[in-house]
Amino acid sequence: MHTQQLISQIESQYLKDNLPEICVGDTVKVGVLIQEEDNKNSGEKERIQFYEGVVISLSKLKNINGTIRVRRILQGIGIERTFLVHSPLIKSINIIRRSKVRRAKLYYLRTLTGKATRLKQRLIKHYRLIY
């Protein structure tokens, strides 16, 4: 077996298979596992912290190194955070809203402020199957 095939076989064990179909422009809510030190019980405490924002870039989601970059505005300051999608520290990714965009990367949102950063909502038709 070649080394590349061996590497891809090992990496496939760690890929998450329950990821939603994420697109650039989506507003997502990412649940990240945070480990805190507890001074009273001298142990570690775990909790899930949610980070909500607009996906401005995607990179290789089918790969073990797949990332999403999420941007949000907090107290007038833009904050971007990059998440490894297949990391065990990512507990959940929920899509809140889908937006219609015409670019693969939304880096131009960095220069915009206020209402100019709004994206047009994309309507999704839900079909009901009748058997």
Curated annotation (Swiss-Prot):
Pfam families: Ribosomal_L19. Keywords: Cyanelle, Plastid, Ribonucleoprotein, Ribosomal protein. It is found in: Plastid, Cyanelle. InterPro entries: Ribosomal_bL19 (IPR001857), Ribosomal_bL19_CS (IPR018257), Ribosomal_bL19_sf (IPR038657), Translation_prot_SH3-like_sf (IPR008991). One of its GO terms (cellular component) is cyanelle. GO terms for biological process: translation. One of its GO terms (molecular function) is structural constituent of ribosome. SUPFAM superfamilies: Translation proteins SH3-like domain. The keyword Transit peptide does not apply. The keyword Plastid applies. This protein is located at the 30S-50S ribosomal subunit interface and may play a role in the structure and function of the aminoacyl-tRNA binding site. HAMAP family: Ribosomal_bL19. NCBIfam families: rplS_bact (TIGR01024). This is Large ribosomal subunit protein bL19c. It comes from Cyanophora paradoxa. The gene is rpl19.
